[in-house]
Design a protein with these regions (language model features):
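Catalytic cores of nucleic-acid ligases and guanylyltransferases
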Residues: 1, 50, 177
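Compact, glycine/acidic-enriched structural inserts
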Residues: 2-9, 58-59, 75, 139-153
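Extracellular/luminal recognition modules and glycoprotein regions
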Residues: 8-26
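N-terminal interaction modules that seed assembly of large macromolecular complexes
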Residues: 20-68
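Short, surface-exposed beta-edge/turn micro-motifs
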Residues: 37-42, 81-83, 114-118
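Eukaryotic short linear interaction motifs
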Residues: 50-52, 95, 128
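Short HxH-centered metal-ligating active-site micro-motif
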Residues: 65-104
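Glycine-rich, aromatic-bearing surface loops/beta-hairpins
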Residues: 99-177
Length: 177
């Protein structure tokens, strides 16, 4: 009897393999992988069982401007890759549920601050992310529960790249005899 495919498990594996490849790429690019003044956009090509191909497309000080740049959508489309990922770094600090005043302190000024690196990816229409801390070996994964402005900007870029693919396909069909 065949075991049914668990798509969430498959996506979890995809997320982890792409995250590992992106982390390896970042770590090969710099000696300070948790301290970058720019967000990075990567094209990602992945087929299960293969090593993901990762290519740097753009860097920008403002992740939202980078994701909103139509040229980056064209570069992703031209890459022919089936996904993309963004990486950004910063500070994280614990949230004090009992004392809202402590939550007013910027993470970079908080006494318990930690350096963090966030990788968020879109692959075949699904979004996932990973969070890594400098002082921790383990990685925290989120398989599709992303919400907020970054998730919206990622979805918008994905939609533009898809529209380019659809437009290109229709253009090629019109040229056939």
């Amino acid at each position: 009897m065949n075991t049914p495919i668990n798509y969430s498990e498959k996506f979890g594996q995809t997320l982890q393999e792409i995250d590992h490849a992106v982390a390896t790429k970042i770590e090969s690019m710099t000696s300070t992988p948790f301290e970058s003044s720019t967000a990075k956009l990567f094209a990602v090509d992945y087929v299960r069982g293969e090593v993901p191909a990762i290519r740097l497309i753009a860097e920008h000080a403002d992740i939202y401007e980078m994701l909103d740049d139509t040229l980056n959508a064209v570069l992703l489309f031209d890459s022919g890759y089936n996904g993309f990922a963004v990486v950004t770094t910063g500070w994280a600090a614990p949230i004090d549920k009992d004392n809202d005043d402590n939550n007013e302190v910027a993470p970079s000024q908080h006494p318990e601050r930690r350096r963090v690196r966030l990788m968020t990816m879109m692959h075949n229409g699904k979004m996932g992310s990973s969070i890594r801390f400098t002082d921790e070996e383990s990685v925290t994964y989120d398989e599709g529960n992303a919400m907020g402005s970054l998730a919206s900007a990622m979805q918008d870029l994905y939609d533009v790249v898809r529209a380019l693919k659809v437009s290109s396909t229709k253009q090629n069909e019109r040229q056939l005899p």
